[in-house]
């Protein structure tokens, strides 16, 4: 590689800027690598397909680096090579300031850079590649409890914690990153990210937060698991030691909010994805499965009662287009399950609570607290 290419490398000191700014990255790893984990602003344009990468990897183990490189060149040559380069050029036309990387910032990055240079495009590659950048994000997450004081927003189910968080610059929305609302009814239509992608998104969100004027890190009160997304241990332990504020909301407002979240939004989302009939069936299945997921904690009798109430409410919705009947089972679910569970959990944190109030009072208190 010539001196020009050596100079055209983005150093590790730039990781924070690249990730926090959402700078476009052309990821030339194989699709299987990208699927396991990637960064929010990256796009997969592989040098080798999965099968080609596997062949080269086997050759490397059995015959060494030189033989593996030779095999790689024989697999990606001629028309195949031109197709790959054309795909890269199309991406770079749309993202002319993009960087590129492979897993370690090694041979694949260098070869891609060389082929692009031969095609007249000068594209820097990132030192250390995906592996080093991911480690940078893991370190960012682990150091977050010391980077800025954490403050935990708690509140009974339906109190509007997520809506509140989204109005605050001090906040990072963990449930949004996990694509899950953190309860039995918390599933999103599009499903959850892989654990690695959840961690990558969390790391990027924390980098953005640390580069903002915010003096505290406001987080919703979460368990270790948000759906199937696990909070990294050091980060979760920091949350467990942080001060707590409690968001209060009257029962009627909570019921209205949960009717909108559990019924209106979920029904609308399924219908938009699957059509009217299949969408309604998927929505009904979502409600039934959500109750079944907490059957052991509800007890058989309570579970069966709630399932029947849901069935009745769905029948009314089908016949008259009226969703108000759903309020009955939501109210019972709150009184028999969510509210007692919340009281038990918040009782264990009583010594960490430093404020409680409604949405307006909480905003006013935070405005003052965040500038201390």
Swiss-Prot record:
BP GO annotations: tRNA wobble uridine modification
Annotated GO MF terms: transferase activity, transferring alkyl or aryl (other than methyl) groups; tRNA 2-selenouridine synthase activity
Keywords tagged on the record: Selenium, Transferase
Reactions this protein catalyses: 5-methylaminomethyl-2-thiouridine(34) in tRNA + selenophosphate + (2E)-geranyl diphosphate + H2O + H(+) = 5-methylaminomethyl-2-selenouridine(34) in tRNA + (2E)-thiogeraniol + phosphate + diphosphate; 5-methylaminomethyl-2-thiouridine(34) in tRNA + (2E)-geranyl diphosphate = 5-methylaminomethyl-S-(2E)-geranyl-thiouridine(34) in tRNA + diphosphate; 5-methylaminomethyl-S-(2E)-geranyl-thiouridine(34) in tRNA + selenophosphate + H(+) = 5-methylaminomethyl-2-(Se-phospho)selenouridine(34) in tRNA + (2E)-thiogeraniol; 5-methylaminomethyl-2-(Se-phospho)selenouridine(34) in tRNA + H2O = 5-methylaminomethyl-2-selenouridine(34) in tRNA + phosphate
Residue ranges constituting the Rhodanese domain according to the UniProt record: 19-142
Enzyme class of the recorded protein, top EC level: transferase
Enzyme Commission code(s) on record: 2.9.1.3
Active-site residue numbers: 102
Quaternary context: Monomer.
Function: Involved in the post-transcriptional modification of the uridine at the wobble position (U34) of tRNA(Lys), tRNA(Glu) and tRNA(Gln). Catalyzes the conversion of 2-thiouridine (S2U-RNA) to 2-selenouridine (Se2U-RNA). Acts in a two-step process involving geranylation of 2-thiouridine (S2U) to S-geranyl-2-thiouridine (geS2U) and subsequent selenation of the latter derivative to 2-selenouridine (Se2U) in the tRNA chain.
Record PANTHER family: TRNA 2-SELENOURIDINE SYNTHASE
Family: Belongs to the SelU family.
Name this polypeptide is given: tRNA 2-selenouridine synthase
The species this protein was found in: Shewanella loihica (strain ATCC BAA-1088 / PV-4)
Taxonomic classification: Bacteria, Pseudomonadati, Pseudomonadota, Gammaproteobacteria, Alteromonadales
